[in-house]
């Protein structure tokens, strides 16, 4: 009994695959349509964003000159996480807003800033994203300067080195056009396939001679031809 049931399931899956294959051009068309929508969205709807990055290096205040150990590096890594919180603090953000005369709140500025710490180092990277490439560079440097001042005031650290100043981005960092087009293509192909599979599962019409024998349990004696096709 299980063998028969398994056979029927296999036949149903095979029939679904046959139906999908017959609709391959429709699936491709829908996928291309969604990919085109992703391209249109990337080029004409979403505003391109530019990212400028600056990096600083912070020395552990308890480390004597020229005597950095592995423990110092580990401690410095933990301190770097503290510095990360200081960089994104309201005081730093408000100072940047004041110095750059920005007309939006600190919460909006915070959304533009990404602070990352290179693994097992005390190097802190500050990235700022903005629709204007020059503004992203200006904000990155302003955030760095305000953050360095705040870190010195809070932790009594004096040795903070600027490894890199904010660069002027020449190309947008987002949107990722290739990624959006690929996502659109995959979503289009996936949705059209799912819809066709559901339609195939719900389709209980008798279409073939085999369907008649399966549903009624009777042997077919013959087929009446369609007169319109004669």
From Swiss-Prot:
It is a multi-pass membrane protein. Changing residue 115 to I: In strain: CNTC 1/82. Pathway: Capsule biogenesis; capsule polysaccharide biosynthesis. Keywords: Capsule biogenesis/degradation, Cell membrane, Exopolysaccharide synthesis, Membrane, Transmembrane, Transmembrane helix. It is found in: Cell membrane. One of its GO terms (cellular component) is plasma membrane. The chain crosses the membrane at residues 25-45, 181-201. InterPro entries: Bact_polysacc_biosynth/exp, LPS_length_determ_N_term. Required for CpsD phosphorylation. Involved in the regulation of capsular polysaccharide biosynthesis. May be part of a complex that directs the coordinated polymerization and export to the cell surface of the capsular polysaccharide. Belongs to the CpsC/CapA family. This is Capsular polysaccharide biosynthesis protein CpsC.
